[in-house]
Each structure stands twice: as structure tokens, then as C-alpha cells.
Amino acid sequence: MSDKKYWIWLSQALGAGARVDEILSAFPEPEKLYFADDAERMTAGVFTRRQLERLNKTKLSDAETAIRVCAKNGWEICVPTDGDYPEELKRLADMPLVLYVDGDISRIKDKISIGIVGTRQPSYDSTCIARAVAGDLASAGAAVISGGALGIDSAAHEGAVAAGGVTVCVMGCGLGCDYLRDNEPLRRRIRETGALCLLYTSPSPRDPK
């Protein structure tokens, strides 16, 4: 777990959408980047000025706080060097450096992952179709990936869960966020068959307990 704090530190410093493929080519181990001086970071030629500033400002203690919160709540921290980190994500130039997982992300390993997302205010027919398609995909052995919103996202998860399949809910909020409390029963079922997944965390993650 000790090396994961450097992955979290780098994720917090870069934020969403960064071209991490270039950064990891220059610094495959975030720990070495953390201890690199300003000259080493600058001459690597993979950081913007803003990123260089954030690397200096981001505190390692915030990453350590995230680790403590995850440990207390039983959440897993998955980074690209872990065996359970999804191979599909590694092909992305802006892949998330850290996955915060409530559940078991290994359930999607060796499965085809298919995303289903849509409006929060779908028609009745659209909801039924999303639920049916997700159920068919899950029954065929695919992992259904969707967000945590109401509407099509929830319908997709409901269909996959009802079919006894695997589904992963990618949450658009930080650790410990009480997001859409009415959807907690569905999230509980998702945890049992798949996982809730957060891609990023705020500098000071909230502890729901």
C-alpha cells in the first residue's frame, strides 16, 4: 500500500483529463517523480506549467488521508500496476491513475465491458429498453458499466443485477459523498454483484462513518 500513496498524490496533482501516458513514459514510478527536483520535472518535457505548479503544491499527506479513509470503510485502492486494474483503461491516454473501489473490481476481469449511459429523464419506453439491453448483455457474460445517476444509468444497473450479471457503477463524486441517497438500495445490490468505482478524490475525502 505504501507505493499507492504516490499514485494518489499524482492523481490529485494532475486532476482529470491529463495525458498520463506521456507522463508515465518519463516517470513510470510516481514515487520517483515525487522525489524528483524541479529541474528533472521540467526537462522531462511532459508537464504543463500549471501541472508543475500543482506537483509542488499537492501534499502527500492528503493521499495518506485517502488511504486511511479507504481502509476504515473497506474500500479498495486500485492502481495501474495492480493485477485487477482493467486492461481496457490502460489503453487510454488519460487513464485514471487511481480507482477507489467499493466492491470487487476483479469481477470484470476477462469480461467484455460495455458502457450504457443516457439521460436522467428518459421516457418509460427508453427505461424499459435500457433495462432489457443491459440484462441481455449481462446474461451473455458482459460487464455493464454505467454512471450513478437516475434514469438510464440506474435502469442499466437494474437490468444487469436482475439478470444475475456483473455491473460497475462509476460515481461522479468524491469518497464518502452521500450521492442520491434514494439510490442507495440499488448501490447496495451493485456492490454485491460488481463494484462502485470512483476515479478521483478531493484533497480531503469525506468519511461517511
What do the predicted segments below correspond to?
Residues 1-3, 79-202, 206:
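Glycine-biased, small-residue-rich flexible motifs in mid-sequence functional cores and linkers
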Residues 1-135:
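Short, positively charged patches
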